[in-house]
Amino acid sequence: MEIRIKEIKENKLIGRKEIYFEIYHPGEPTPSRKDVKGKLVAMLDLNPETTVIQYIRSYFGSYISKGYAKAYDSKERMLYIEPEYILIRDGLIEKKEGE
């Protein structure tokens, strides 16, 4: 798996970096969010506690997936802005009992 950064936008108003990337994974299935997040955090020297993978999109018959991630300046801002289901999906918060 190889990740290529296509664009990084600095959103100072919200306090985050917006990262657009492509994943090359010939002969392999679409990589998991956990694997992609780990590689992005290592590549860009980000904090794993404030980095969220918004989506990874794969296309039929292609070994290229496109993704979008957000890296926040603070955990408080991330918890305020991001929808709960995204935070649960990325493993940043626990799912509430009974849901």
Curated annotation (Swiss-Prot):
Keywords: Ribonucleoprotein, Ribosomal protein, RNA-binding, rRNA-binding. Signal peptide: none annotated. Transmembrane segments: none annotated. Coiled coil: none annotated. One of its GO terms (molecular function) is rRNA binding. GO terms for cellular component: ribonucleoprotein complex; ribosome. GO terms for biological process: translation. It comes from the Archaea. HAMAP family: Ribosomal_eS24. Belongs to the eukaryotic ribosomal protein eS24 family. May be present in 2 copies per 70S ribosome. Part of the 30S ribosomal subunit, where it binds 16S rRNA at its canonical site at the bse of the body, as well as a possible second 50S binding site near 23S rRNA helix 45. This is Small ribosomal subunit protein eS24. It comes from Pyrococcus furiosus (strain ATCC 43587 / DSM 3638 / JCM 8422 / Vc1).
